[in-house]
A protein has these predicted regions:
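Positively charged n-region of N-terminal signal peptides that target proteins for export
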Residues: 1-4
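Bacterial N-terminal signal peptides
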Residues: 8-15
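Lumenal/extracellular ectodomains and adaptor appendage modules
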Residues: 19-232
Length: 232
């Protein structure tokens, strides 16, 4: 009962403002992008499914991307960024997995000697890299899964996901589905923020919140931010 009430409260305050100075993300991830760092004008992200699973002492994220190649078949290196806010921390993912077309794939981890600036107060510290073949006029799926410690937001805690790196593909993200599942009565969702934008269609089912958005044009720093209160 306590958890359901808190989910309801979270929906009431979904548009709470968050600033980079208040938030301290220890480690998080983001949408995959072509490592050329230039916008790919042929391959479009048709859909992105982002699944948060909240536990008492950490959270898991599983993300599935659906791409369609409107140009000729091509194989490119794509990178999944690991990022944080500018704070003295050595935190890392507890684990990381990846798939292409539902098949588990190997990846290369690129440790950065010097962090790459992403935006004011945000830096990329590591890349998870793999080669993906995008067949012409076909849908290619890629999937990542990782586990991370909660970040800090004032006296509260936070969970984050950076979807702004999805801006490096053709046009907009046609559809974005965000699913937040709370597994414990020890975690309360106080607020959800998605890049100062309208949250689209919201569905609440028991201990799960589902948000559906269409035609998303992210900025490179666009993120999903959950403000949480955790009982100790």
């Amino acid at each position: 009962m306590k958890k359901s009430i808190c989910l309801f409260i979270g929906i009431l305050f979904l548009l709470l403002s968050v600033s980079a100075n208040d938030a301290y993300t220890k480690v998080s991830g983001g949408s995959i992008l072509p490592l050329s760092k230039t916008k790919n004008e042929n391959i479009k992200m048709e859909k992105e499914e982002i699944n948060f699973t909240l536990y008492k002492d950490h959270y898991d994220i599983n993300v599935k991307f659906y791409f369609k190649n409107y140009g000729p078949t091509e194989t490119i290196e794509v990178g999944f960024p690991q990022w944080k806010h500018l704070q003295p921390t050595e935190d890392d993912f507890y684990y990381f997995k990846s798939k292409v077309n539902d098949v588990t794939t190997n990846f290369t981890v690129k440790e950065l000697e010097k962090s790459e600036p992403l935006d004011e107060g945000m830096v990329i510290t590591k890349w998870y890299i793999r080669s993906v073949t995008f067949e012409s006029n076909e849908i290619t799926t890629t999937e990542v899964e990782y586990s991370a410690p909660y970040g800090v937001y004032g006296i509260s805690e936070s969970a984050d996901y950076l979807f702004g790196t999805g801006a490096t593909w053709k046009d907009c993200i046609d559809e974005m589905i965000i699913k937040i599942m709370n597994t414990t009565d020890d975690v309360w969702i106080n607020a959800i923020r998605i890049d100062n934008s309208d949250l689209g269609n919201i569905i609440r089912e028991n201990n799960t919140i589902v948000i559906q958005k269409k035609n998303v044009y992210p900025k490179i720093e666009s993120e999903i931010f959950l403000e949480l209160e955790i009982g100790r």
